[in-house]
Amino acid sequence: MSYTSYILAFQLCLILGSYGCYCQDTLTRETEHLKAYLKANTSDVANGGPLFLNILRNWKEESDNKIIQSQIVSFYFKLFDNLKDHEVIKKSMESIKEDIFVKFFNSNLTKMDDFQNLTRISVDDRLVQRKAVSELSNVLNFLSPKSNLKKRKRSQTLFRGRRASKY
């Protein structure tokens, strides 16, 4: 790699690094704006302990953590939807939703739309209840870890095959 390439790579790292700091600074500012608007820094907010943080700390495995994170993200989307008419904090909420979109949904709009559609389904609707029960066995099949067993068996077979060929 030539000297010029090193300089260009270094400049690119600086630009990308400063952009990340800028985004994080903006996100921090918007979060602080929401806290101030909702008076979330007062002492009574601490009563009863944290709402989500202890739960997040208890769930260590990535797949388990994703389940909890999805419930928490769902809560925040409902919260933002509840506060959508408050013009003073609208920009802050949009910035935070954008950050959630990037971090949780990997910037995939279809995933986010599907997620939001799921959170809007009314459990009180009798037709929805009937549809959900009708689909229950299929959903349970999706939830079962069968696909992991197939992958594990396939990799074990490949591993055994390689080991056998060595001897």
UniProtKB/Swiss-Prot annotation:
A single BP term in Gene Ontology: defense response to virus
Pfam families to which the protein is assigned, alphabetical: IFN-gamma
Compartments reported by the entry: Secreted
InterPro entries in the record: 4_helix_cytokine-like_core, Interferon_gamma
Known glycosylation sites: 41, 108, 117
Entry comment describing in which tissues the protein is expressed: Released primarily from activated T lymphocytes.
Gene3D superfamilies reported in the protein's UniProt record: 1.20.1250.10
Primary subcellular site in the record, as a coarse category: secreted
Modified residues (Pyrrolidone carboxylic acid): 24
UniProtKB keywords: Antiviral defense, Cytokine, Glycoprotein, Growth regulation, Pyrrolidone carboxylic acid, Secreted, Signal
Keyword Signal: yes
Purpose of the protein: Type II interferon produced by immune cells such as T-cells and NK cells that plays crucial roles in antimicrobial, antiviral, and antitumor responses by activating effector immune cells and enhancing antigen presentation. Primarily signals through the JAK-STAT pathway after interaction with its receptor IFNGR1 to affect gene regulation. Upon IFNG binding, IFNGR1 intracellular domain opens out to allow association of downstream signaling components JAK2, JAK1 and STAT1, leading to STAT1 activation, nuclear translocation and transcription of IFNG-regulated genes.
Subunit structure: Homodimer. Interacts with IFNGR1 (via extracellular domain); this interaction promotes IFNGR1 dimerization.
Family named by the database record: Belongs to the type II (or gamma) interferon family.
Protein's name according to its UniProt entry: Interferon gamma
Organism: Oryctolagus cuniculus
